[in-house]
Amino acid sequence: MRYLTAGESHGPQLTAILEGVPAGLELRAEHINKELARRQKGYGRGRRMQIEKDEVKITGGVRHGKTLGSPIALVVENRDFKHWQTIMAVEPIDDEAEVKRKVTRPRPGHADLNGALKYGHRDMRNVLERSSARETTVRVAAGAVAKRILEEVGIRVAGHVIEIGGVRAKKLDYRSLEELQAVTEESPVRCFDPEAGQKMMEAIDWAKKNGDSIGGIVEVIVEGVPAGVGSYVHYDRKLDAKIAAAIVSINAFKGVEFGIGFEAARRPGSEVHDEIIWSPEQGFSRRTNRAGGFEGGVTTGMPIVVRGVMKPIPTLYKPLQSVDIETKEPFAASIERSDSCAVPAASVVAEAVVAWEVAAAIVEQFGQDRMDLIKENVERARRYAKEF
């Protein structure tokens, strides 16, 4: 399974083409729209989310509510495009006023300058329109399709926020993934700990008041993945490596860890590795899950636990210093409409990209063409592991 996306932040639409999704999967627009609505929520979002109400159009690969096995085409309209039709026109324009609106002041922390150097753009709008986090809209749409695959084989995915602006959640004593999801869906910052959630909102308010931005840490948990998914044979087949790449590919994400993560560097081996246990009811398992569900790039059967670090959004209403690429004079960086904090929304994006990688691994390992055969093969793998 793979997907490609196309479209600019203020262009007419965003598009995703999904290849390799098995035939026979029940899929409706409402499955995807539910995830798109979750992405648009979150304390600290900017005015753009008041303009857009993201809804998907499925224009290929689905008939009568089921996937066909052919490529799936997903389209999400940018409603704000009506205000940008001249600036984002496909054909050449001769409107001098619009030409003068080109972006020549790169923003620190963005792809503006690097992208202009790479592609030879003198107007950095050509860079920022595509490097914008608006593109994650269709990545969430693709992830919604992946979640449907995982649901069919009894695999559940949940994401939540564990830190914003230095405020870290301490109360994480949820008894099930369902409880975690129920509580975080009601939290404006998608945090299970209500006391920490309140302090996170206060930190976001402070950032907004001061024209600044703050980042944080999100966690994604995947339960129900059979042992033995992924591979230790080659570096590019390790499932944890694919998930790590997917997490860091999200806009503004700068780090990733599994299980106890970087804490492993500060502990002796006896406090890092998970002891193996066995019972007639469960077969082989682990006493703990410090590895976060992976050993050697292969799933252990324990929950996958992965965290990603999101830096503060670089677009600031109190802009940092930069240099105009035309005049070479120092200026305060350009300001684009932005959020004070997008960590809650980013947890939904992280869910989506992790779901895609896990679903792709399941489809590859247990049969690529038909959903019914994949379900049979996954159940067979679970029985095999239990009886091993």
Curated annotation (Swiss-Prot):
Its EC number is 4.2.3.5. Pathway: Metabolic intermediate biosynthesis; chorismate biosynthesis; chorismate from D-erythrose 4-phosphate and phosphoenolpyruvate: step 7/7. Signal peptide: none annotated. Belongs to the chorismate synthase family. PROSITE patterns: CHORISMATE_SYNTHASE_1, CHORISMATE_SYNTHASE_2, CHORISMATE_SYNTHASE_3. It catalyses: 5-O-(1-carboxyvinyl)-3-phosphoshikimate = chorismate + phosphate. GO terms for cellular component: cytosol. InterPro entries: Chorismate_synth, Chorismate_synth_AroC_sf, Chorismate_synthase_CS. It holds the Pfam family Chorismate_synt. Reduced FMN (FMNH(2)). Homotetramer. Its cofactor is FMNH2. One of its GO terms (molecular function) is FMN binding. NADP(+) binds at R39, R45. This is Chorismate synthase. It comes from the Bacteria. It is an enzyme of class 4 (lyase). Keywords: Amino-acid biosynthesis, Aromatic amino acid biosynthesis, FAD, Flavoprotein, FMN, Lyase, NADP. FMN binds at R130, S131, S132, N251, A252, G296, K311, P312, I313, P314, T315, R337. This reaction introduces a second double bond into the aromatic ring system. CDD domains: Chorismate_synthase (cd07304). It comes from Geobacillus kaustophilus (strain HTA426). GO terms for biological process: amino acid biosynthetic process; aromatic amino acid family biosynthetic process; chorismate biosynthetic process.
